Amino acid sequence: MKTILAALALALATTAAFADTVKIGVIGPFSGPFSTSGKNFKAGIDAWLALNGAKVAGNDIEVIYRDVPSADPGLSKSLAQELVIKDGVQYLAGFYFTPDAMAVAPLLEKANVPMVVMNAATSAIVTKSPLVVRTSFTMWQNATPMTQVVAEAGVKKIITVVSDYGPGIDAETAFKAGFEKQGGTVVESLRLPMATNDFAPIMQRIKDSGAEGLFAFLPSGPPTLGFVKAYNDNGLKAAGVKFFATGDLTPESDLPVLGDNALGLQTTYHYAVSHDSPENKAFVEAARKALGNPAELAAPAVGAYDGMFVISKMIEATGGKPDAAKAVEAVKGLSWVSPRGPVSIDPETRHITQNVYLREIAKDADGNYINKELRTFEKQGDPGLAGK
């Protein structure tokens, strides 16, 4: 390990010190079952470059992409080392899955490279290195407001269903903590293997639990589409079992497939493509153009777009030179108006503070399915970092 870290530091010093090109290495799922999210990373980055130009503080920007099709900490670590040693990147970014970000974080200080997390959502990631900054969200951040929504709906008994990995456990813990404070009861907590694709038995367990509603988190992709379809197909909606989830369950790219059966499903999330603001209109136009298929645009794109903004401020602060500590220090407390709304980087946690929205699947005036914003929970930090 020490040999690897020494090589990282030496490689960065020799390859980047004289460069007028600042290289950014982006690790994400650009093939395989989660490739739509990888495409959204790239679309968000391309949108930022299209609207702001590919030069910052006199330095040309070059983005290098590396593919991790599904959660693979070993591959992510290997690719990060390659990006720093071979390609000479000054910044690492992307990271769709928490285990991948966790695997790379220990390399950052010796390599003198900041990491900008554009999606991975376990609270603890930012505690693994002082050089981690997050522009996405956390499960605690998005799940906690939903407990208030559920309580106000008069629901007293809930079953939680999550994927069995870091973000899922965070979502389960956050919801349970908040819901019990509201006077509710979690009657059962189900943790599903990441590879789960048959949800009919899960739906039967939900029915048998006696819960009035379910709260769910799974990573956006084939699992979430399968879960929401199973909720409808197995009669839970008809039986009156209410559906509550984080927005990961209803990405815009899934809505046309889910169709009218999904109308009315409510989620809490930090972004909706339908968000009404000048900043979002410009972003959506540029990101959809970059994607090629407008229907695929989803939240990972805005995490990547804002990640590029943060990296640009780091480059300005360092003059394009490799100084990870100075780069991160420069963005602590940074605030701006994102396509998602007003945001800032918490100077203590280096996590993004942002609005969280209650959304409902609806149709717009043109008959397109959207996540319609109903309510705003302003300036949400990360409750999951309390006491850490």
How would you describe each model-predicted region?
Residues 22, 332-388:
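Solvent-exposed, acidic/polar segments of extracytosolic/periplasmic ligand-binding ectodomains
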Residues 69, 77-78, 122-124, 128-234, ...:
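Extracellular/periplasmic Venus flytrap/periplasmic-binding protein
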Residues 36-41, 51, 55-126, 135, ...:
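Beta-alpha junction/loop-to-helix N-cap segments that form part of ligand/metal-binding clefts
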Residues 228-305, 316-318, 322, 365, ...:
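Extracellular/periplasmic periplasmic-binding protein-like sensory domains
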Residues 83-96, 116-118, 157-162, 210-220, ...:
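Periplasmic-binding protein-like
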Residues 69, 116, 123, 194-195, ...:
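Venus flytrap/periplasmic-binding-protein-like
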Residues 15-19:
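Sec/Tat signal peptide C-region and signal peptidase I cleavage site
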Residues 25-44, 48, 66-74, 96-99, ...:
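Extracytoplasmic "Venus flytrap"
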